Amino acid sequence: MGTKRKIVDVQFYKSDTGNAQVKEWLKKLTPGDRKNIGDDIRTVEFGWPLGMPLVRKIDTDLWEVRSTLSNNRISRILFTVCGDMMILLHAFIKKTSKTPKNDLNTAKRHMSHLERKK
């Protein structure tokens, strides 16, 4: 029985000013919530590609990791995959059944910024 290998490595999207929104967002969560999200991201790292209920495709090259936090809160981390890199673009606590347009647009803007930097 061999050691399971990562299929994708995680990287935080950084703006031109070096701001990593997802990393900063994670720091504000409780240790338990960070662990839940970390476990879910690790599952994606080792099992990519995955589908529901953990990962849902939102748009072309854009997916979300769906995590349950304490107090029945739900978080979403929007990401893209470039080669063997899973790039975490945007994160938020979900408050409605649909992904808010503003959060979706933020992730898409970060994704196009990555494309321009290539």
Which stretches of residues belong to each language-model region?
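Basic, Lys/Arg-enriched alpha-helical interface segments
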Residues: 1-73, 83-85, 93-118
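Short, surface-exposed beta-strand/loop micro-motifs that present aromatic residues
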Residues: 76-80
